[in-house]
């Protein structure tokens, strides 16, 4: 996460900083981190060079702020009312459907907004790796909490491992998102997230399990 020593700004200053980060995040999603310069961010955000220097030490600092913002975006996506607490098979299916609905608007344009950053920062320093790891840990944790509750209620068998299933959901999403972006095909992400949900469903007690629905039943919007 960004340095704790980052100076505190006024409310207006925080708003300006957040706007710059939002602009940088959008540019980095479209062009990549390496393809996004500080000058491009400054011009697009319509701020001065002194403002950039005031809010960010350098491009690395700005990139860390973008990681933090995208981490918040992931949490917000998973907080949609229809997803509840991700603690039912219906909620997990709604999660898969929500991702499929975003294929044309998001995933075919740049992949996953968080995963695309991680992919480009594989060779980054340990501090940035820590930022990215924190995001993935939090993401997995959202599913983990819901799956623990499902097992407690008896919606999953006692032998179900909530941590294993949570990691499977996030890993399936990330792999599917990458392949959908690379191939420009909706099929990989659609197949991956639906297969991950069906894997969770396979741990439901026999009396509550149902037949898997066809993976291609729901078509992406757009």
Region annotations inferred by a language model:
Residues 85-86, 124-128, 137-165, 203-213:
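Hydrophobic alpha-helical bundle segments that form small-molecule/ligand-binding pockets
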Residues 110, 115, 160-179, 195-199:
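Hydrophobic alpha-helical segments that form the core
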Residues 65, 79-111, 162-169:
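Hydrophobic alpha-helical connector segments
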Residues 76, 97-144:
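Short secondary-structure transition hinges
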Residues 102-105, 149, 169-187, 199-209:
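Amphipathic C-terminal alpha-helical segment
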Residues 68-75:
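Short, basic, alpha-helical segments at the C-terminal edge of helix-turn-helix-like DNA-binding modules
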Residues 1-15, 206-222:
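N-terminal intrinsically disordered/low-complexity leader segments
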Residues 2, 19, 23, 27-61, ...:
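Helix-turn-helix
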């Amino acid at each position: 996460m960004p340095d704790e020593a980052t100076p505190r700004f006024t409310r207006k200053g925080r708003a300006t900083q957040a706007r710059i980060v939002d602009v940088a995040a959008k540019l980095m999603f479209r062009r990549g981190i390496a393809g996004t310069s500080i000058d491009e961010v400054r011009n697009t955000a319509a701020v001065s060079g002194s403002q950039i220097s005031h809010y960010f030490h350098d491009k690395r600092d700005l990139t860390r702020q973008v990681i933090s913002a995208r981490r918040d975006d992931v949490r917000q996506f998973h907080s949609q009312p229809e997803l509840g607490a991700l603690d039912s098979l219906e909620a997990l299916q709604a999660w898969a459907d929500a991702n499929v609905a975003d294929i044309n608007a998001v995933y075919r344009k740049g992949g996953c907004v968080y995963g695309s950053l991680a992919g480009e920062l594989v060779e980054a320093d340990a501090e940035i790796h820590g930022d990215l790891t924190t995001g993935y840990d939090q993401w997995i944790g959202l599913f983990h909490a819901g799956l623990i509750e499902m097992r407690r209620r008896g919606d999953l068998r006692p032998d179900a491992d909530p941590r294993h299933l949570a990691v499977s959901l996030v890993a399936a999403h990330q792999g599917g998102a990458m392949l959908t972006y690379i191939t420009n095909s909706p099929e990989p992400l659609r197949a991956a997230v639906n297969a991950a949900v069906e894997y969770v469903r396979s741990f439901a007690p026999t009396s509550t399990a149902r037949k898997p629905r066809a993976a291609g039943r729901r078509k992406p919007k757009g």
